[in-house]
């Protein structure tokens, strides 16, 4: 969490801070991403999604404490690190979603896609529950 691995510094403290600090404005967050309200309780640092409000973020993405950071890959390659829970989760699928502005309508009209889109948050919820977090 602080830029070291096994006592060896690999990132400066400043780099870690910038990566894990939300850099998006309220105006940026007004716009959906991939047809979903991605920014609810989240922001984006340098190349990482960052949980800014766990209460708002949890219903859409599953649990993750304040400061949890992740990579929400558009094609299903997703990971999350929750420093407060000392937990790292990996969820890797390969799926080419509809990336158009009409993505939400495409998902709404396809029950299989709707289930696929909810699989990752279910995975997160079940993992936290199984670990008693």
Question: What do the PLM-derived regions correspond to, one by one?
Answer:
Residues 1-133:
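Catalytic loop of the DD-peptidase/beta-lactamase superfamily, centered on the K-T-G motif
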